């Protein structure tokens, strides 16, 4: 047995430990076919950069689950991997190239992809280093990447099979277009923001010049693509105009007036300009009336030749130029400033442009119905917390067809080929013969991610060992912000292609926020690098904070104050472990277990030993129960209270009565209970704080705590009598301590303690444990009896079954104490007067910085609280001498 360092140093504790675990292969599945399998696939992080605090939280929760299940004897697999993250990664690489004055088009597709693979290798290495520093117990022998050949094969099969069923189709529709990334986006890749904008009101003159129809738009630059104006066929103001024409300003082209219910008589003038190539509602109107589709923009957001003199202008530049021209022509009625919601690309931040485009889509109605129906069966996915099942169902009910093609080079190239005759071939392999050209677009990243739980297990080879043993997976851990992006798609793809749920449980966590409750973001500059936190506090402290503040579905606020508390808790564990091991005298864990069995059988030990084992039993039961419900925060609070309050503050202190005695037999038993309880504590804590628990465990045990058995309840430890007795003993000691503190009597001063109880069992218990009472209360005189008479002047504390009297004559001189309190009251009044004068100065309040004023207000509140407490103490003292 070696000795723990005098001071807890997380850098020393954690250095090299992860590599030792990897070298020992302790993270791989046990291979025990008799054991029940338990599997998790890691939500693959994007290879776009370093991991953030949200990733740290997400992976910590997974590691807690898998470490506990491993210790419980499950055949565990935690499969790691990363996502190619098409648009995000390509944007990063293009940004790096732009700094060198190079575009992807300068390189060409193949050389550009070489650059992206270099990026992927660089950041994949960084991510794995971060996983190591976090202590994640993943099985690297099964590491996957969404562009691996095995996963690519699965992607091609799914695409081809859905195409053959008619559930993947190619069509021309209005989609969300990112002009910066030059690619289509799905609805959920669009972030809507309220921005300052305007409604531009314009007059379109009837062809005979008799009157004008007023239309309004937020995007006047699209008017070059107007092909009609629409009015409601039931609107009496305009129904006679249906079939006539108006003159499109600037372009001087006649366009028809159509009757369509899309035009709302109650909104604006009731007249709507129709631009089928640039608005989804207008597209549908165009379909109903067989209108042409005129696209007036290039894919980079500039105007094309159909915009006439405005060709080549950026769309926003063209907006201002168009408005100026309309004003010059007298066609601009007015500009109405208004805040409105505008879609932005989640990745590039560019304003999204609704644009007519030929894309590939997944038909969603049958897939969504299948997913919703499955939630009514025994094979349903259980959400934690359950309310997210409703969220999932609502999204599925309102789902649109999914645009899956992206105008990128990085990703799974669509397995479709075209020839000069206009034929399309879709297959897992390229068609035979010459003259075929593969579609240049790639699939949406989420298309391959949706297959992650089963493609990583070897599917479409359903005979693969991993697929047969570990699929469906057991639990998915993810944030509520990607339930629709990812969770729902995994569910419907898994049901379609494996006829099974992808996972049994989904644990939903919230977001990491800063101390003020704001979402962490680059724009706010409030992001926290988890590696910086680990460098200062250690991985275990970060993991304890992340788990201890965790409740399913809830957000967590990060603060350094909480990190300090986490470090302090681990330091406490370190110190009590060091104390126990230094007093261990060579006792082995096996010997301790044998001696503890004697305590449970009441053959050895004392009531405090029985009490701590009883409470340990309860702690094991409650922690295990809450782990099973993914209530890690609740489990953490239970552990914290048991370790710090019951074990360290009480039991360890109580054992000093034995350890400092001459009774060698009792010492052995006490050391045994200390070591045994410490061992169980470390095992309970290990899933949350793996490094420090391994370091301490290695001081007294063989092997790794990673594969040590997780604690279970021992029925023989149940002892309500011991529990009740020691709790009464604690109440007694607390009552005396509180009374001393109330009248400022030092613990070192001996006092008289009189205890009156009519409970003979309690009297016997106190008398039989008189040494503990004396050690913790320091009495000069101690009497415990049913015949005690209450002194005339005494502090009285009532506990269950007894009254405790502390005669005032032993405690203090009341007159002197009142004089001292009067002085203290005057001091706080003086402080209140000073700060009150400052805050009463209007010039100070008006001119000082807000934080300075707030500091004075905080002082005032603090002084007032101290004044009130002192005054209350004076009142209590007067009561005592009446």
Swiss-Prot record:
Q: Can you cite a GO biological process for this protein?
A: valyl-tRNA aminoacylation
What molecular functions are annotated in GO for this chain? aminoacyl-tRNA deacylase activity; ATP binding; valine-tRNA ligase activity
Q: Where does ATP bind?
A: 522
Q: Which family does it belong to?
A: Belongs to the class-I aminoacyl-tRNA synthetase family. ValS type 1 subfamily.
For this entry, the protein name equals Valine--tRNA ligase
Q: Where in the cell is it found?
A: Cytoplasm
Its Enzyme Commission number(s) read 6.1.1.9
Its UniProt domain note says: ValRS has two distinct active sites: one for aminoacylation and one for editing. The misactivated threonine is translocated from the active site to the editing site.
Q: Which gene produces this protein? A: valS
């Amino acid at each position: 047995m070696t000795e723990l360092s005098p001071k807890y140093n997380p850098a020393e504790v954690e250095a090299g430990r992860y590599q030792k675990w990897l070298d020992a292969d302790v993270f791989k599945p046990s291979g025990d076919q008799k054991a029940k399998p338990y599997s998790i696939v890691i939500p693959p992080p994007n290879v776009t950069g370093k991991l953030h605090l949200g990733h740290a939280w997400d992976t910590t929760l997974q590691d807690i689950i898998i470490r506990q299940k491993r210790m419980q004897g499950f055949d565990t697999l935690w499969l790691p991997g990363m996502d190619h993250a098409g648009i995000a990664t390509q944007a990063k690489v293009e940004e790096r190239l732009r700094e060198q004055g190079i575009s992807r088009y300068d390189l060409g597709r193949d050389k550009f992809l070489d650059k992206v693979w270099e990026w992927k290798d660089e950041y994949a290495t960084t991510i794995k280093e971060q996983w190591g520093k976090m202590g994640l117990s993943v099985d690297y022998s099964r590491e996957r990447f969404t562009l691996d050949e095995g996963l690519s094969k699965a992607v091609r099969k799914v695409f081809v099979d859905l195409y053959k069923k008619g559930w993947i189709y190619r069509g021309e529709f209005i989609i969300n277009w990112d002009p910066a990334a030059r690619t289509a986006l799905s609805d959920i890749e669009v972030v809507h923001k309220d921005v300052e904008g305007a409604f531009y009101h314009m007059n379109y003159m009837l062809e005979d010049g008799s009157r004008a129809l007023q239309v309004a738009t937020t995007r006047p630059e699209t008017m070059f693509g107007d092909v009609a104006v629409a009015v409601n066929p039931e609107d009496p103001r305009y129904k006679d105009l249906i079939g006539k024409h108006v003159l499109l300003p600037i372009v001087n082209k006649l366009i028809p007036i159509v009757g369509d219910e899309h035009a709302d008589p109650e909104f604006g003038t009731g007249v709507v300009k129709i631009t089928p190539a640039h608005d989804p509602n207008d597209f549908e109107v165009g379909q109903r009336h067989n209108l042409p589709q005129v696209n007036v923009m290039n894919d980079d957001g500039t105007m094309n030749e159909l915009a006439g003199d405005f060709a080549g202008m950026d769309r926003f530049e063209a907006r201002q130029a168009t408005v100026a021209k309309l004003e010059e022509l007298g066609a601009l009625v007015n500009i109405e400033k208004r805040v409105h919601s505008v879609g932005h690309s989640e990745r590039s931040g560019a304003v999204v442009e609704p644009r007519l485009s030929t894309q590939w889509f997944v038909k969603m109605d049958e897939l969504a119905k299948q997913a919703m129906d499955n939630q009514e069966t025994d094979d349903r996915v259980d959400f934690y917390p359950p309310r997210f099942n409703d969220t999932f169902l609502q999204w599925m009910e309102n789902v649109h067809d999914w645009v899956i093609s992206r105008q990128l080079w990085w990703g799974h190239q669509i397995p479709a080929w075209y020839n000069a005759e206009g034929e399309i071939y879709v297959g897992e392999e390229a068609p035979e013969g010459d003259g075929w050209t593969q579609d240049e677009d790639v699939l949406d990243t989420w298309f391959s991610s949706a297959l992650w739980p089963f493609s990583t297990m070897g599917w479409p080879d359903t005979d693969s060992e991993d697929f047969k043993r570990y699929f469906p997976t057991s639990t998915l851990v993810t944030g509520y912000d990607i339930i629709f992006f990812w969770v729902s798609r995994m569910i419907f793809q898994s049901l379609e292609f494996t006829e099974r749920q992808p996972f049994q449980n989904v644990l939903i966590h919230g977001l990491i926020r800063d101390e003020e409750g704001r979402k962490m973001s680059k724009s706010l500059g409030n992001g926290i690098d988890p590696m910086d936190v680990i460098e200062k506090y250690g991985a275990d402290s970060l993991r304890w904070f992340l788990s201890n503040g965790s409740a399913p579905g809830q957000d967590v606020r990060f603060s350094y104050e909480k990190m300090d508390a986490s470090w302090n808790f681990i330091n406490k564990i370190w110190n009590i472990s060091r104390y126990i091991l230094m007093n261990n005298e060579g006792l082995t864990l096996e010997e301790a277990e044998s001696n503890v069995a004697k305590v449970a059988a009441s053959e050895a030990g004392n009531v405090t030993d029985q009490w701590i084992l009883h409470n340990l039993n309860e702690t094991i039961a409650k922690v295990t129960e809450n782990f099973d419900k993914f209530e890690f925060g609740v489990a953490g609070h239970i552990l914290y209270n048991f370790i710090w309050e019951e074990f360290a503050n009480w039991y360890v202190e109580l054992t000093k009565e034995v350890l400092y005695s001459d009774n060698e037999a009792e010492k052995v038993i006490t050391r045994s209970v200390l070591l045994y309880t410490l061992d169980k504590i470390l095992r309970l804590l290990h899933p949350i704080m793996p490094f420090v628990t391994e370091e301490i465990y290695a001081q007294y045990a063989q092997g790794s705590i990673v594969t040590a058995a997780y604690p279970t309840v021992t029925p023989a430890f149940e002892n309500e009598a011991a529990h009740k007795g020691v709790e009464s003993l604690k109440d007694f000691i607390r009552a005396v301590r509180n009374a001393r503190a109330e009248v400022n009597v030092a613990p070192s001063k001996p006092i008289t303690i009189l205890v009156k109880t009519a409970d003979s069992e309690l009297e016997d218990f106190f008398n039989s444990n008189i040494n503990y009472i004396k050690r913790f209360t320091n009495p000069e005189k101690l009497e415990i009896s049913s015949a005690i008479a209450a002194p005339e002047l005494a502090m009285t504390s009532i506990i269950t079954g007894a009254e405790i009297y502390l005669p005032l004559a032993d405690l203090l001189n009341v007159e002197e104490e009142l004089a001292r309190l009067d002085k203290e009251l005057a001091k706080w009044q003086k402080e209140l007067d000073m700060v009150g004068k400052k805050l009463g100065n209007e010039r100070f309040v008006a001119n000082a910085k807000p934080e300075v004023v707030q500091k004075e207000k905080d002082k005032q509140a603090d002084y007032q609280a101290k004044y009130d407490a002192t005054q209350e103490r004076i009142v209590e003292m007067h009561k005592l001498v009446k």
